[in-house]
Amino acid sequence: MSARVAVITSSYPRERGDAAGHFVESEVKRLLRAGHDVHVFAPGAGSTESNGATVHWITDRGAFGWPGALARLKERPTRWLGASEFCARASSALRKQRSFERVQAHFLLPCAWPIALNGDRKSELELVGHGSDVRLFCRLPRVVRTRIARAWLARGAKLRVTSRELADALGAATPELSSSLSVEPSPIDVDEVPTRKLARHALGISETKSVALIVGRLIPEKRVALALHALSLLDNLCAVVVGDGPELESLRARFPDVHFAGHLPRPETLRWIAAADVLVSASAHEGAPSVVREARALGVPVVAVPAGDLVAWAERDPGLLLVRPE
């Protein structure tokens, strides 16, 4: 049955090719395919129509966007004012439109709380945790976590997280939520990605060249240097890094033979994945990494370290090899 659905998110593509919140956009597309009337409430500015959904852009004064809210707020603390303004305006917009049968809030903070609780109490409430938002929630004082959890439960909210690791962490931090939790990785969309041959042709890569690809934010937690050091020990292998971050210049200096492509639009990133012989990840802090799922969906082998749900995935996927750094 078709329903009017509100999707609240602090991350959503503002233009074609924008990688921010692409997994939320995939959720919206799934709702649209099911015949629902979808309204997205997101920070920033852009087109008011996206793939058939109505988008309500809300002022945030630069608080949200790439490379993520926490990084942006840490970089410039005055952006907290913009984050507060987004919460107030999004809550107001939700209150004004009380005809949604269903509200889907992505990111536990600030969308599931406090924004989603300001909508019509008759709306079905679905809350989705993705990663850093869940870990931030788990670090809140116990009394605050309990208060928020009880508010969600009082509304009959259904909670979904994208990995078993996140479910375990959330259940341990707030046991009262355990019975309401489900695990489901975010949908991914690789339908328009070119074949390996076409991707290599577009990127100017010969069929005989072996390419190892790393995709991600260049921060210490991702351990890109560890991955590049391991790749440097292999002969006749071209290493490519897609992504940006504070470690970029030091990595360039340390690994001069590596091609650093920088931060790319999502279609270009997916083209690189399709063209690669292997995707490599040395990050030990992952739940259900989208880039690994995208690579496997495109038939690209993955070498990674044991982290999050990768351990369970590797048991049933011979194309996912886990190694432990020595």
Regions found by a protein language model. Name each.
Residues 1-57, 232:
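N-terminal subdomain of nucleotide-sugar transferases
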Residues 143, 193-205:
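A short helix/loop element that forms part of the nucleotide-sugar donor recognition site in Leloir-type
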Residues 160, 206-222, 228-232:
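Conserved donor-binding/catalytic core segment of Leloir-type glycosyltransferases
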Residues 249-267:
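Nucleotide-activated donor-binding/catalytic signature segment of Leloir-type glycosyltransferases, i.e.
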Residues 263, 271-276:
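Short alpha-helical donor nucleotide-sugar binding micro-motif in glycosyltransferases
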Residues 284:
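Aromatic "clamp/platform" in nucleotide-sugar-dependent glycosyltransferases that forms part
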Residues 301-304:
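Short hydrophobic beta-strand element within catalytic cores of glycosyltransferases
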